[in-house]
């Protein structure tokens, strides 16, 4: 089984600086990188000097969703801006990520499906996300029909270990 470490770029670099012997796999969030003028076109340049085996691009939909929830109660977050789907598609195409996750729509399985099908038509092999509690057989069959040959399970970030099982 392959494991990918998620976290901010600062966490990644701190971890990599202190654990440089073993190759690592990273999950990089578009929500945190979208404002960067530098496209992640070469993982070797971005992670220069670190032993990064591969990395996956995540849409960051949950980060944006969580920021929107904070904004509703008067708290601010720099990641609360919505994600421009066209920009995400182009960003993913230009990146050197080994895989990318589709732009899921929290609480809207049909919106998630529409986004994924658009990404697939644009040539991305985006990994579909099926959120916790929304896994119907038809949704699983649809996700399996895509080009990624993988399925992600979403909606578990705030679940306990027992709930995730």
Regions inferred by a protein language model and the residue ranges of each:
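Conserved anion-binding
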Residues: 111-134
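Glycine-rich phosphate/ribose-binding loops and adjacent secondary-structure elements
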Residues: 126-165
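Short, surface-exposed basic-aromatic patches at helix termini and helix-loop junctions that form
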Residues: 20, 117-121, 143-147
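Non-catalytic, usually N-terminal nucleic-acid engagement modules in DNA/RNA processing proteins
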Residues: 1-114, 125
